[in-house]
Design a protein with these regions (language model features):
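Short, well-ordered alpha-helices that flank and scaffold nucleotide-derived cofactor binding pockets
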Residues: 8-12, 125, 152, 156
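Helix-rich cap/lid subdomain of alpha/beta-hydrolase
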Residues: 20-74, 79-89
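Active-site nucleophile elbow and catalytic-triad environment of alpha/beta-hydrolase enzymes
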Residues: 81-99, 113-118
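Post-His helix in hydrolase/transferase enzymes
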Residues: 143-158
Length: 161
């Protein structure tokens, strides 16, 4: 959504937009997520508090993502524990329905089939003329697991004149 806002407010700087893994939800869905995730949480005092981060980063990792890389992702997530509320707050308070339709640049949405599959599809529908490419074989860890697949779609799109 940061790319959307930059493109809308500074169209002279943004020639094309490539989006992927978009956490877009309708107003009710955003409010529910903001209420749940937008408040600073106290530092965890048990593993149970961070278990979901571990499951996502390590246990659900793509088979092509090394344990070392997955563990690093987990540590990064844990280190940002209290900062996550500000990130989620910005994402879930962003007026996407108002801003996305203002995009005038060619837009490509790559859609891996992880947990943001449906939200990404819905966001693409807000953008007039957006191209949506489904990537059903990709789910998580896509930058590590399939950079060549992403590049095979991104390069031709970004290199167009």
């Amino acid at each position: 959504m940061l790319a959307t806002e930059l493109a809308v407010t500074h169209p002279e700087l943004v020639r094309r937009i490539l989006l992927m893994g978009i956490p877009y939800y309708d107003a009710e869905g955003r409010q529910e997520r903001f209420d749940r995730l937008g408040q600073v949480k106290p530092w965890p005092d048990s593993f149970a508090a961070v278990a979901q981060d571990w499951i996502f980063a390590v246990e659900m990792r793509n088979e092509k993502v090394s344990l070392e890389r997955a563990f690093g992702n987990y540590l990064e997530s844990a280190g940002a524990w209290q900062g996550k509320a500000r990130i989620y707050g910005a994402v879930f308070q962003y007026p996407a329905e108002e801003r996305a339709p203002l995009l005038t640049q060619p837009t490509l949405v790559l859609n891996p089939h992880g947990n943001l599959k449906e939200p990404s599809r819905a966001y693409a529908e807000l953008i007039d003329g957006a191209t949506l490419i489904e990537l059903p074989d990709l789910k998580y860890g896509i930058f590590d697991a399939a950079p060549e697949v992403l590049a095979s779609h991104a390069r031709p799109f970004l290199n167009q004149r």
